[in-house]
Amino acid sequence: MHPFSRLFRNIQSLGEEEVQELLGPPEDALPLLAGEDLNHRVADALNLHLPTADLQWVHKTNAITGLYSNQAAQFNPHWIQPEFPELHLHNDLIQKLQQYFGPLTINEKRKLQLNFPARFFPKATKYFPLIKGIKNNYPNFALEHFFATANYLWTLWEAGILYLRKNQTTLTFKGKPYSWEHRQLVQHNGQQHKSHLQSRQNSSMVACSGHLLHNHLPSEPVSVSTRNLSNNISDKSQKSTRTGLCSYKQVQTDRLEHLARISCGSKITIGQQGSSPKTSYKSISSNFRNQTWAYNSSRNSGHTTWFSSASNSNKSRSREKAYSSNSTSQRYSPPLNYEKSDFSSPGVRGRITRLDNNGTLPQCLWRSFYNTKPCGSYCIHHIVSSLDDWGPCTVTGDVTIKSPRTPRRITGGVFLVDKNPNNSSESRLVVDFSQFSRGHTRVHWPKFAVPNLQTLANLLSTNLQWLSLDVSAAFYHIPISPAAVPHLLVGSPGLERFNTCMSSSTHNGNDSQLQTMHALCTRHVYSSLLLLFKTYGRKLHLLAHPFIMGFRKLPMGVGLSPFLLAQFTSAIASMVRRNFPHCVVFAYMDDLVLGARTSEHLTAIYSHICSVFLDLGIHLNVNKTKWWGNHLHFMGYVITSSGVLPQDKHVKKLSRYLRSVPVNQPLDYKICERLTGILNYVAPFTLCGYAALMPLYHAIASRTAFIFSSLYKSWLLSLYEELWPVVRQRGVVCTVFADATPTGWGIATTCQLLSGTFAFPLPIATAELIAACLARCWTGARLLGTDNSVVLSGKLTSFPWLLACVANWILRGTSFCYVPSALNPADLPSRGLLPVLRPLPRLRLRPQTSRISLWAASPPVSPRRPVRVAWSSPVQTCEPWIPP
């Protein structure tokens, strides 16, 4: 049925004879449909012209919102946070894959090397203050969202997905280190790494015996025992560790005094002749700036754990003994580690033994509330004093490594949303690294192939048994180089963010900036913390502290991540495909699809792949593993042997939205954009395709309103109620050729020549399109040869609207191949000349598979390699099945 038959009969400006002519033979109707006058008359009848500016626009239509209609995000206080398994790919992944699948191809090696490890080094990076770490997307649930997001980040850290910043040059994480992390090891499982300890001892001995004495002591030879010097300093360090009362400046002064005493004939004195130690320190320490050791008493055991007065004495003594036994391996510390440290030593009630960036003593907010008197009935002091042991202020992972300088800043904010539109019970972390997609810090991401609709139909429209697999937390499988951590920083500002007048640091030893901390003591905060305490328990203290973390695995908020994930999964699919040539295996992002002729054979392949993936460290989501039978559901489509159709849920959603559109009201262009996005998904399955939406495209491009008439709306509804599948292309030889001039057209086949003229001159592209439509109508050929690039592209939205709609209906399922004008046998008939008698050019269509590497011809598996399936395959190996 003609797509415009009902529409033309409902337009009163078109007479009955004119309608019959427009619906008549194509050689007469197609040139008329290209006329400008007819298109304007139909547009006036359908009210498709853009409205005037004095009308008031509609900004919301039921489920679709437009301009000035920001939809508030919904926070779920009962969100379930996902649990992440130990995601750790095998350390020698490429060698392990070669054991399973044999020698890898060049492309497979290249793709895997891009991901092992991934590298991300933008030219410029903007750093934001820590207070912007957690975005306040839910103002009514700010406190609940803050603790839920902080808990999500700590969950990722415990799974080995994030690094925790200890100081500006040190990172700590949980899990097994990779080979590139071994080179930066500081400590592993609480033990100081040998290479790091040896390098620190060597540098310290050289600094003591050589550089320092040469610059600041007399020129005559001096006998200095570096062993005694190091032991003396170590004894002082242990003593100060036990007492917990020695400051950083005092340690430096003691070391300078020791160097002065061992120098023979030196006149350097400290603390004598009426000069204060502070003055002497300032006058001398400048010469020792680059060679002074930083005293860090919490290198290995540095958790600030807070206990109440009742249970403090016994626990502190046991911690002192355990700590002093390990202090011999910590006698030297890198410079700046203590000055920039974010951790503290084992704490005693009311005492902090760490320094902040200004050399003063910062205060734990939780401890401060304990040591102050309650300000009222809703004071946080009542919550803090309810437990004797709140646990550590921070934690240290299994592995500590060195890193490039990492500032106390972040590069992107985080917040929580629903896991997907159909699952609001679970949460998903959103990382905003949009600075790398705009502005002067924009990064041009690499492009990768995405399967289009025709490619999926060509490759997957087969009568096979299908199975789909889903990689659990696929992005978090791919590791990142530690050097990229300073560009991928997230964090939490701590509970202090809810009181902007307060800072967690103190100045000159007093608590001047902590005097306003009781501004947090409100009824809302108090009741919220009580409810959160039921959820998190003593972990609430850890979540209330500020922290900074960097991604150790691939984050989802960077444009590089989809590219790297696509390379990784396509390389894995290529290996499986090469070893099982009798089945179909392809991957797109984190979805892996297997196809075989029988379900028994598919089960065997599935069991083998699961065991291989488990050994490699790739985790599959068992809950999302689905057996589809002969109807594969993939990317929102239903793929069968007869073609591809959209899933029912998309068709129902489209019909519901389209019926809710009001008639004869100007809708703003944002509503048109959102509606067009929904209609575009199903448009390839309609008779007129994308051309039916050209009036909406025009309104969106003009950034103006659009008015739906009742005729246009009913016509769209009739189009989208009748859907046709997209079928696979066939590899056939071209036997029909078409060509045109502005005044005539010509068609050449193997047995006849056809030609004709137009009633009036037409643009050359329009004439070529009409000639192709006539060739399709009269010969029924599925493959046409033409020399016009516009017709070859298949994009008909640049033609007159009525002609584009009818041409899309006629040429549906038709393929084109290019033939040069000199070799086109229809060229001379289109000019009204007799053609030269010569054979037709032999052009064969190759079905479109170039948009994605789902399948490629590969060499057979070596016969010496053991079979991959334990029992004999139902498919004969001598006749492998090859996708079309």
Curated annotation (Swiss-Prot):
Domain Reverse transcriptase: 398-639
Residues that bind Mg(2+): D470, D590, D591
Keyword Phosphoprotein attributed: no
Region (Spacer): 185-387
Region (Polymerase/reverse transcriptase domain (RT)): 388-729
Entry's EC annotation: 2.7.7.7, 2.7.7.49, 3.1.26.4
Ranges for region Terminal protein domain (TP): 1-184
Residues under site feature: Priming of reverse-transcription by covalently linking the first nucleotide of the (-)DNA: Y68
Keywords from the named record: DNA replication, DNA-binding, DNA-directed DNA polymerase, Endonuclease, Host-virus interaction, Hydrolase, Inhibition of host innate immune response by virus, Inhibition of host RLR pathway by virus, Magnesium, Metal-binding, Multifunctional enzyme, Nuclease, Nucleotidyltransferase, RNA-directed DNA polymerase, Transferase, Viral immunoevasion
Domain text: Terminal protein domain (TP) is hepadnavirus-specific. Spacer domain is highly variable and separates the TP and RT domains. Polymerase/reverse-transcriptase domain (RT) and ribonuclease H domain (RH) are similar to retrovirus reverse transcriptase/RNase H. The polymerase/reverse transcriptase (RT) and ribonuclease H (RH) domains are structured in five subdomains: finger, palm, thumb, connection and RNase H. Within the palm subdomain, the 'primer grip' region is thought to be involved in the positioning of the primer terminus for accommodating the incoming nucleotide. The RH domain stabilizes the association of RT with primer-template.
Similarity comment: family membership: Belongs to the hepadnaviridae P protein family.
Function: Multifunctional enzyme that converts the viral RNA genome into dsDNA in viral cytoplasmic capsids. This enzyme displays a DNA polymerase activity that can copy either DNA or RNA templates, and a ribonuclease H (RNase H) activity that cleaves the RNA strand of RNA-DNA heteroduplexes in a partially processive 3'- to 5'-endonucleasic mode. Neo-synthesized pregenomic RNA (pgRNA) are encapsidated together with the P protein, and reverse-transcribed inside the nucleocapsid.
Listed name of the protein: Protein P
Organism: Woodchuck hepatitis B virus (isolate 59)
Source lineage: Viruses, Riboviria, Pararnavirae, Artverviricota, Revtraviricetes
